[in-house]
Regions:
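Residue(s) in the substrate-gating loop at a strand-loop-helix junction
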Residues: 143
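Active-site helix of classical SDR
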Residues: 123, 159, 167
């Protein structure tokens, strides 16, 4: 019997895969059998070494998704380097922390451009390819703030609420064409983006006190959800926003 979770012969494009959540997702997909294209502003040297150590092919694409200018080039370089594309993971993200009363237009635009605008246009470019080939998996990275308001991160909250919305929209439009669009909503993860929170003793304690798992998540915690949504095991899952949060939203 074939393994519905196998990604053998598949190619996944992961944005922002040089570190943190993107790296964890890329490695999980590679462990399941996928070859990996990684697009980002920094060279994903460590990710490349780890993926190749698993016996998978790897293509690194330098691109800054604060604008949509490199979107088509990212797709073209993926296809040129690996010959196909089956899975898109829109992981590249940015966060800026300031009280709403003081939040700047520049910070608003930067976060929205990376987190929402580029994610949509990456999905559009990949979606055209997926529709032509009759299959494809889009995995967006949402957030607990796709469900909640948060504090001091107005553009991040807006962008992640938007990610949930466009995930459902793409599922509605492309589901009949063999393309699924789903999202993973990570909880509090121990990454560079949360270093400031973890360094604040009181804030760190208040967060941990609410998480039933009683710990911060790590990038590898997203691996199972990513492999599921990338594989044929999830072919009838579409438009879902799946929390991976240690139980945070259950409280």
């Amino acid at each position: 019997m074939s393994n519905p979770f196998s990604l053998e012969g598949k190619v996944a494009l992961v944005t922002g895969a040089n570190t943190g959540l993107g790296q964890g997702i890329a490695l999980a997909l590679a462990e399941a059998g996928a070859d990996i294209a990684a697009a980002g502003i920094q060279a994903p040297t460590e990710t490349e070494e780890k993926v190749k150590a698993l016996g998978r092919r790897f293509v690194a694409i330098e691109a800054n998704l604060i604008s949509i200018e490199p979107v088509q080039r990212i797709l073209d370089e993926t296809l040129a380097g690996l010959g196909r594309l089956d899975i898109l993971v829109n992981n590249a993200g940015l966060i800026r922390r300031t009280d709403a009363v003081d939040f700047s237009e520049q910070d608003w635009d930067d976060v929205m451009n990376v987190n929402l605008k580029s994610a949509f246009f990456m999905s559009q470019a990949a979606g055209r390819h997926f529709i032509t080939q009759g299959s494809g998996k889009i995995i967006n990275i949402a957030s607990m703030l796709s469900f909640q308001g948060g504090i001091r991160v107005p553009s991040y909250t807006a962008s992640k609420s938007g990610i949930a919305g466009i995930t459902r929209l793409l599922a509605n439009e492309w589901g009949s064409k063999g393309v699924t669009a789903n999202a993973i909503a990570p909880g509090y993860m121990a990454t560079d983006n949360t270093a400031q929170l973890r360094a604040d003793q009181d804030r760190n304690k208040s967060i941990l006190d609410r998480i039933p798992a009683a710990r911060w998540g790590v990038p590898a915690d997203l691996g199972g959800a990513a492999v599921f949504l990338a594989s044929s095991a999830s072919d009838y899952v579409n438009g879902a926003i799946i929390p991976v949060d240690g139980g945070w939203l259950a409280r």
